[in-house]
From Swiss-Prot:
Belongs to the helicase family. RecQ subfamily. GO terms for cellular component: nucleus. This is ATP-dependent DNA helicase Q-like 1. A motif (DEAH box) lies at residues 335-338.
Length: 606
């Protein structure tokens, strides 16, 4: 490459860096080092097309150290400790809250969870029945133990009716939606089996969209892929069938913190026995669970495992074969299924190996679930899990009650945030997402001290007890606003969140959709706002470089996703709702947004 051509390419690379928000002087210094590293023999490779991502990675490394990025590994380590403590307490006979069918067998291990939250224990929601005859009807249709009885016994429910296709369900019976109104005997009689079980076990009077179809597919031992937006009720799609079918349902989940939340809810709120296995357990803890699974009548209905347990444990696979031979392997559930795809925003290599489930157990149904998957990710997941012809149950990604908006940051962004909260969200509950731990703390401090707005902050570096207290204060309304990193969101389900503000753009459209989707779960109007300035993107690049472990392929993939998020923020006239939906492969007419009650900012202006 000639000198003049090299200078032209250097100008292009500097332009690329500044366009993405990097400081020009820093970019020039880094580029000089970059050129020296390539040397004379590598000059031909110094182009935007051939080394643009490498240059951005080097620039991110050059600027590293100015911010502390969040890492959920700290939360994962704490979750492992909590789970281990729960397990140890549950295997202590003096603490054991379960009865057993084999009282004379001292070797039997019953697994349940002891609550580790400072919150007062809530009483389970009980479906009240009109009379003793109604109760007899419940017990006739399902052998459901009352909530005061043991939950360790195997609950083998039969389905009276079966439909040939997933979509061929009858319309839901309309039951009064008043929270405290007892269903009448006639209403109970009119329910189909799944509706009846949903009411009796989980206290839900109606199914949300697609839940019934997903549950029916599971009961008929059919594979399926469920795509539901955040707050759509994915967990019920496998938890309800798991309680009705004989045997154990295996749930693969990527994070121990998610597993902890699920097990606590199942055991304490619904009285459904669930336990877990992961690679961090002691050998004696793992052996106790495996021993229980090999019994003729395992006590647990759901077993949560991390993906490496499936791919890397021959003893666990042999235990699954033992269950299968006895007809007690009820099904596999792959939660957060987008982690399977190398094109997804949260790819995990261990998830890629889960195709072995269908390979080893071809007759056992697989249910995959996710809240965020593009069309290409969806196809990759189906292929990788070896269920290419599985029906895809997909809800619309359009959250019609959410209003999307991007606001360009001013020279005083904190003051701008203060005015936004004061003028538009006074006395309302919301989340302010921040990119780093330091940003999270600084924003919360500003709102508390300068604005006199009661605010708490949440990131993985906050001690566990303090995080629990922060979540409790926000959930109960004692504090309206929480400033948080990506660590906040797992297990969060607060209905009346009126706004989600991203103080810095998210790292990917999938992440933004999921985080902003925590607003308006009560169906009422809520606003999703991103505060944007070009130089913030350089911080996203640094975060991605830090989080990808210097793996260039993963960094390049993450960069491509981040650039899509930047494009969303820089839309001048195009419909933001349309871009979000089309990103997930859903066609959308912009006129619908324009004429809706919650048009995006661009449609509102046009």
């Amino acid at each position: 490459m000639k000198d003049q051509d090299l200078e032209l390419e250097k100008v292009r690379l500097i332009s690329l860096a500044t366009k993405l928000g990097f400081d020009e002087d820093s970019a020039k210094k880094c580029l000089d080092r970059f050129v020296d590293l390539y040397g004379d023999d590598g000059r031909d490779f110094i182009t935007v097309e051939l080394c643009g991502d490498d240059f951005l990675a080097a620039l991110a490394d050059f600027e590293e150290g100015t911010e502390e990025w969040d890492d959920i590994q700290a939360i994962e380590s704490e979750a492992q400790g909590n789970l281990a403590e729960m397990f140890d307490k549950s295997t202590n006979p003096s603490d054991n809250g379960f009865d057993t069918d084999d009282d004379d067998d001292d070797s039997r291990v019953e697994v349940h969870v002891i609550e580790d939250s400072p919150e007062p224990k809530k009483k389970p929601e009980i479906v009240e029945l009109d009379s003793s005859s109604d109760l007899e009807d419940v017990e006739t249709r399902f052998k459901v133990p009352r909530r005061s009885q043991t939950c360790s016994r195997s609950m083998d429910y039969s389905m009276e009716d079966s439909v040939s296709t997933i979509s061929g369900r009858k319309p839901s019976v309309q039951i009064s939606n008043k929270d405290h109104e007892t269903p009448s005997y006639e209403e109970l009689q009119a329910l189909d089996d799944l509706e009846f079980a949903n009411l009796v076990i989980f206290g839900n009077k109606v199914f949300r969209p697609l839940q019934h179809q997903a549950c029916r597919a599971s009961m008929e031992r059919k594979d399926c892929f469920v795509l539901m937006p955040t707050g759509g009720g994915k967990s019920l799609c496998y938890q309800l069938p798991a309680t009705l079918k004989a045997g154990v349902t295996i749930v693969i989940s990527p994070l121990l913190s998610l597993i902890q939340d699920q097990i606590v809810a199942l055991n304490l709120k619904f009285g459904i026995p669930a336990t877990f296995l992961n690679s961090q357990q002691t050998s004696s803890q793992a052996a106790a669970v495996l021993q229980e699974l090999r019994r003729d009548n395992p006590s647990c209905k759901l077993l949560y495992v991390t993906p490496e347990k499936i791919a890397g444990s021959s003893s666990f696979l042999e235990t699954l074969r033992c269950l299968d031979r006895k007809g007690l392997l009820a099904g596999f559930v792959v939660d957060e299924a987008h982690c399977v795809s190398q094109w997804g925003h949260d790819f995990r290599p261990d998830y890629r190996e889960l195709g072995c489930l269908k390979q080893n157990f071809p007759r056992v149904p697989v249910m995959a679930l996710t809240a965020t998957a593009t069309e290409s990710v969806c196809q990759d997941v189906l292929k990788s899990l070896r269920i290419p012809r599985a029906p895809v149950l997909k809800m619309s990604f359009d959250r019609i009650n959410l209003k999307y908006e991007v606001i360009v940051k001013t020279k005083e962004p904190l003051k701008q945030l203060q005015e936004l909260l004061r003028d538009r969200f006074k006395d309302q509950s919301g989340i302010v997402y921040c990119l780093s731990k330091s940003e999270c703390v600084d924003v919360a401090k500003f709102l508390n001290e300068k604005c006199k707005v009661k605010t708490v902050y949440y990131h993985a570096g906050v001690p566990a007890k303090q995080r629990v207290d922060v979540q409790r204060k926000w959930q109960t309304g004692e504090v309206r606003i929480v400033c948080a990193t990506i660590a906040f969101g797992m297990g969060i389900d607060k209905a009346d969140v009126r706004f989600v503000i991203h103080n810095t753009l998210s790292k990917a459209v999938e992440s933004y959709y999921q985080e902003s989707g925590r607003a308006g779960r009560d169906g009422l109007q809520a606003q999703c706002i991103c505060l944007y300035q070009k130089k913030d993107f350089s911080r996203v690049v640094c975060m991605l470089r830090n989080g990808q472990g210097r793996n260039m392929d993963r960094f390049k993939s993450a960069m491509a996703q981040a650039k899509k998020m930047q494009q969303y923020c820089e839309l001048k006239t195009e419909c933001r709702r349309q871009m979000l939906l089309e990103y997930f492969g859903e066609s959308f007419d912009r006129m619908i947004c324009k004429s809706s009650l919650n048009p995006c900012d661009n449609c509102e202006r046009s």
